[in-house]
Amino acid sequence: VDIIIREARTEDAAKLIEYTKLVGAQTDNLSFGKEGIGDTPEVEKEFIKRINSDPKSVMYFAWKNDDIVGCANISGMKRRMSHRANFAISVAKSEWGCGIGSVLLEKCISFAKDNGIEIINLDTRSDNIRAISLYKKFGFVKIGRMPAFSKINGEYIDADLMYLDLREKSNNRRKMEAFERLEAIRRENKDEVDFNKEREEAINKKHQIQPQSQ
């Protein structure tokens, strides 16, 4: 069965609520449980409208037949933090290991690059090895750990804080240009460098103590 990835629409609100109840019951890695997000279709419609009207926010759904089996969103920030966005993702347990998470994350990163987002932030349970491995594969870096980030059945759960710096390619380009400039200078000064080296070797040879003849 083909998986279809597309942006959220207001008419998806009821399906989204069903999906959050499903995934909430399947894992403790989310901020909600089997109750789902607890909103009505009307509230979710307004939520989707707000996302779709924000040029720096997006929500993607992965569809299998007529059901949502994956969800990811980029939430743009405002004013002096408008270069940043928060990221969240979930996938139905039946689809774990099928690559849906990678496709959704790739879509969100592409959206961020196309819409002027330079930094993507996320948080994830520190023991969620599967998710952390996925994020690292796409270049996310751990920048800290927050203790007692969530509390489930009386147990405190730590979270890793991670980010993806989309400026990295431009930084690497600048580093490469600087390296090329240094190489050009080195080539221009090669004759002088070789001369100095020969002079140093000659001086060392001149002052070298010769073994006495028997």
Where are these regions (language model features)?
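Short linear interaction segments
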Residues: R174-Q214
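Conserved acetyl-CoA-binding loop-helix of GNAT-fold acetyltransferases
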Residues: G97-S110, D114, S133-K137
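A short beta-loop-alpha structural element at the N-terminal edge
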Residues: I4-E18
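Helix-loop element at the rim of GNAT/NAT acetyltransferase active sites that forms part
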Residues: E18-E35
